Amino acid sequence: MKILRKNHPLLKIVNHSFIDLPTPSNISSWWNFGSLLGMCLVIQILTGLFLAMHYTSDTTTAFSSVAHICRDVNYGWLIRYLHANGASMFFICLFIHVGRGIYYGSYVLSETWNIGIILLLTTMATAFVGYVLPWGQMSFWGATVITNLLSAIPYIGNTLVEWIWGGFSVDKATLTRFFAFHFILPFIIAAFALVHLLFLHETGSNNPSGLNSDSDKIPFHPYYTTKDLLGIFLLLLVLMILALFFPDVLGDPDNFTPANPLNTPAHIKPEWYFLFAYAILRSIPNKLGGVLALVLSILILATFPLLNTSKQHGLIFRPVTQVIYWIFIANLLVLTWIGGQPVEYPFTTIGQIASITYFTIIIILIPVSNTIENNIIKL
């Protein structure tokens, strides 16, 4: 078996990626989230496939088909809630994964980092089109509001919106194409994830100390496969608790009402994992400005490798930037809270302050703290 896995053309790739891969001996549990994301993707594709067997992408029957899945299909309720809450687990793992990358300076591996940003954007797009499919009130109005933002693009905006809608409003054509996108995008994510791994294994993994670990590597299997399995079991435990005991805790009550174009919900808001970006969008009174801020809130992650001037790798020995980092995380939580609040004082003001803080920390405060710490080292 040993000879086969080292010589077989296909098994050799698996062997070099998951078995004999030289890995730093000191990577902590924060490095588990890559494998957890892979697990989440597998769960989402499998549950999604079974849901697609019973779902109909037609405005007249979409809502009923979801109710049919929950009521009449064997364990349909479980598959549906695993899929819905699996998306939340996916984004929790994603945000922790990105946060770990920022904290430990993984962005210096720029190819891996940039593919990761593409993965984040693609996952957000997949989740958005998926949220439209149950065709509840929040699905319909969320789709209307978010797609309508494209009309802010000069010259081609209105044409682009009608092209995406497939008509003059969100209707059957929109639902059908969103279902098609939602079906194909996870497989594109899987392909990008392989490219992400390919680039990571070109350079080798980062480690908590931020020091070169070439002299202290251990094989991935059995050490980290066992460690990853523990993480996967814990993830599945949390997911099952969510799906079985609190299936609707992260959903919106408005989505239990079928879509009605004549009745607007009091507060239109996306799923919790988009609230931080939604708060940034709403904090700018100008439509085009809001859309640009929304896009930049994610794309700004690409500036981390460019703005990094620190002589040290990661934040483990950098107390000044550590403080700024945790302020940044707290600020993100504030943005998430504000995104779910109505558009009125004092929430709008708090949202504007938090949005300015978000960009200021990344563009100004972190580079300044890098310079301060570099000068402290010279003393």
UniProtKB/Swiss-Prot annotation:
GO CC annotation terms, alphabetical: mitochondrial inner membrane; respiratory chain complex III
Cofactor field: heme b
Entry's Gene Ontology molecular function annotations: metal ion binding; ubiquinol-cytochrome-c reductase activity
Membrane topology: Multi-pass membrane protein
Record's keyword terms, sorted: Electron transport, Heme, Iron, Membrane, Metal-binding, Mitochondrion, Mitochondrion inner membrane, Respiratory chain, Transmembrane, Transmembrane helix, Transport, Ubiquinone
Cofactor binding summary note: Binds 2 heme b groups non-covalently.
Binding site for a ubiquinone: H201
Phenotype upon changing Y104D: In strain: Isolate MN 48041
Transmembrane segments: 33-53, 77-98, 113-133, 178-198, 226-246, 288-308, 320-340, 347-367
Paired cysteines (S-S): none
Keyword Oxidoreductase set for record: no
Main subcellular location of this protein, as a coarse class: mitochondrion
Cellular localisation: Mitochondrion inner membrane
Sequence positions that bind heme b b566: H97, H196
Binding site for heme b b562: H83, H182
Signal peptide range in chain numbering: none
Gene Ontology BP terms: mitochondrial electron transport, ubiquinol to cytochrome c
Record Pfam families: Cytochrom_B_C, Cytochrome_B
Quaternary organization: The cytochrome bc1 complex contains 11 subunits: 3 respiratory subunits (MT-CYB, CYC1 and UQCRFS1), 2 core proteins (UQCRC1 and UQCRC2) and 6 low-molecular weight proteins (UQCRH/QCR6, UQCRB/QCR7, UQCRQ/QCR8, UQCR10/QCR9, UQCR11/QCR10 and a cleavage product of UQCRFS1). This cytochrome bc1 complex then forms a dimer.
Main function: Component of the ubiquinol-cytochrome c reductase complex (complex III or cytochrome b-c1 complex) that is part of the mitochondrial respiratory chain. The b-c1 complex mediates electron transfer from ubiquinol to cytochrome c. Contributes to the generation of a proton gradient across the mitochondrial membrane that is then used for ATP synthesis.
Alphabetized PANTHER family for the sequence: CYTOCHROME B
Further remark: Heme 1 (or BL or b562) is low-potential and absorbs at about 562 nm, and heme 2 (or BH or b566) is high-potential and absorbs at about 566 nm.
Name of this protein: Cytochrome b
Organism: Akodon mystax
Gene: MT-CYB
